[in-house]
Design a protein with these regions (language model features):
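PRPP-associated nucleotide enzymes
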Residues: 1-145, 151-198
Length: 198
């Protein structure tokens, strides 16, 4: 469902009242954090800043049905294999970025029969946290997956953390790439869809 700017402002304000951080709201709405900040600080009466160029990506139709997540993950897995020159032995672990990359990571790892790990990004916690309940990344060759790449900061942060932990990051993979980037931190970036603002 398309939301007007006023509807987005109300939705952002509601999420803020519920205690979500700017980062969490951005993840929930698939918008950049700068857009969320603009929606919070610029009302109709106080529209001092120019509206940021952003595109809202809604993929609830996919996320609500596991069979659809599996179908898209099959495409993700094919892209991973293509990048690995069709040799899955070159890969140890799929890392999903919490929260929206988890479903895809789990399904891709299942299809490729490799480990799955979960990274929770956090601005104030030295780059985030790799969950100890899942696969680990030290000394492993990994692919990182998320839903939407808005600015690249979350992916860049995750790659940096994984490399510090001793992982060799082979590929960054997203459902939608909202940037012109083809690599992040020297890691190839592939998006199933790329958006371009004209």
């Amino acid at each position: 469902m398309a939301l007007s700017i006023d509807e987005l402002r109300r939705t952002v304000a509601k999420y803020k009242q519920q205690g979500l951080s700017t980062e969490q709201i951005a993840d929930e709405l698939s918008l950049s954090e700068s857009t969320i900040l603009w929606l919070l600080t610029n009302t109709n009466e106080n529209n001092s800043e120019e509206r940021p160029a952003d595109i809202r990506i809604g993929w609830r139709t996919i996320g609500a049905r596991p069979i659809r997540v599996a179908a898209l993950s099959n495409i993700f897995a094919d892209v991973v294999l293509e990048e690995m020159n069709w040799d899955v032995e070159l890969l140890d672990t799929i890392v999903g970025i919490s929260i929206n990359g988890i479903l895809f990571a789990h399904e891709i790892a299942s299809q490729l029969n490799v480990d799955v790990a979960i990274h929770r990004d956090s601005k104030g916690a030295e780059g985030g946290h790799l969950s100890t309940k899942y696969g680990q990344v030290g000394g492993k060759r990994v692919v990182v997956v998320d839903d939407v790449l808005s600015t690249g900061s979350t992916m860049k942060n995750t790659i940096s953390v994984l490399q510090k932990m001793g992982a060799e990051v082979l590929l960054a993979l997203v459902l939608v790439n909202k940037t012109q980037l083809n690599e992040i931190e020297g890691v190839p970036l592939r998006g199933l869809i790329r958006t371009v603002t004209v």
